[in-house]
Amino acid sequence: MDGPSSASSSQPDVAQPSRSTARLARIARTLNQMMTKRGYEVDDDLDAAEAVIYDRRTDLERAYEPISAEGTYGPCAVYFAADKGAKVGVGPIRSIVQRMRSDDHHHAIIVAEVGLTPPAKKACRMIQEEGVRIETFVEAELLYDVMEHEFVPNHTVLTEAEKELLLRRFRLDGDATLLPYILTTDPVARYLGLTHGQVVKIERPSTTSGKGVTYRVVK
């Protein structure tokens, strides 16, 4: 008589997605949502399961094209750094910068598993002095869409023309620094890629007027 072991062996061997693959799929979805909110074109047909190509053994890249050139550095390249299980050092940063230069990219997002070493952070700051913008995220920050949290109000980045109209309406003599501020280190500011001097419109539900609107300058 066949025992339990022979019965179980007759079951089809179906490969299950690894935890790493599922994690990377979530990151890929969040990246697409984030870049969409920033005004970049995103392939709507991209299957999240394709995130498996972002294997941390190699530096892999995806480039996003902006829908509008206003307020952007042109295409944004997203790199998944290769130092699996460790902080990313200067070497991978230099390799990424070389690839950016060869591809004529001036804006990049680097996704690291556990962060960057202090020298790598310094290297990023130095390259940004040359007019290149580099943003860094750890994977844990991209496991969810911060804008989908029920307590996060709607944020809309004003165009330069809208900003000028606002400053005139508030009679601020063109000085946006007189507005309340939001720091570039704020999670929503980082998610939206806000930079110094930009103005963001924040809409919150209000019990009296239905919707409360405030404006903040990025500091």
Predicted regions and their residues:
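Helix-rich terminal scaffold detector
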Residues: 1-106, 118-130, 134-135, 140-145, ...
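Short beta-strand/loop turn elements enriched in aromatics
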Residues: 148-177
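Short, structured beta-strand/loop micro-motifs enriched in basic residues and often containing a Trp
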Residues: 174-186
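Short, charged beta-turn/beta-strand-edge "cap" motif at the junction between a beta-strand
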Residues: 204-210
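Short, compositionally biased
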Residues: 210-219
